């Protein structure tokens, strides 16, 4: 993890300034939706591009992620089995040449879902393992037991507003600096919030090449997330999490783009179970289509290290950008 983040930092140090048309530096606004991790203030995947001066960007995304993990040690038991649907509204406003402000408002639902059978078939088609998916289909059970004491349990469908995030960004030489504060507006008992305020800070860079006479953009970022004293498994929660990511996007035609991105983050909990205590490496692949002022995007996310990332995820999102 340290070596990978160091490589991202090296990339940032030699990045070019963001191009004027931020459409070519777009990314899928993915983040980890592991039920025990999505409550914290990790920003969604972003690039160095800002809204145009005096303009704004509005985005809406729908994420559906599915988990089927369990573990047991001499003194602990963990179960993560269910489906999470997250609908997020994102607004960015360029209020000054050197300042962009933003807000992200999520709505989160945890349920048994309907995708277990489809995911088993998907994994079989790709030659991936289904060894974690030998339990009943479409059930909800998120639980953590330590020394015979149930520290957390959720086994019925819940939903509600998640933790709202306020953000600011500014250009800094060849880079973009982004900071965010996540507020405790969700409910820890429903896993729609952590019950604490988190603060993040990241450095973002991008550069653009030409491939087959079309723009090929590379983006990367590295940052740190400071966690407040949350109410979900507080005995095990860490206070600091590093994160980073890289993305490649090719404008294949005037309206159609292809992209892939890799996001990484450190562990949030000191526990024997990598399912909530391990590092996260998530791969996202997909495409986007420009229809007037709207950019429509579809992405599929898969875990790379089979630990703290959701087992399967897909996202449909749309972005509207307006200049002054």
Predicted regions and their residues:
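Cleavable N-terminal export/targeting peptides
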Residues: 1-29, 324
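Transmembrane beta-barrel domains of Gram-negative outer membranes and organellar outer membranes
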Residues: 20-192, 199-228, 241-253, 257-300, ...
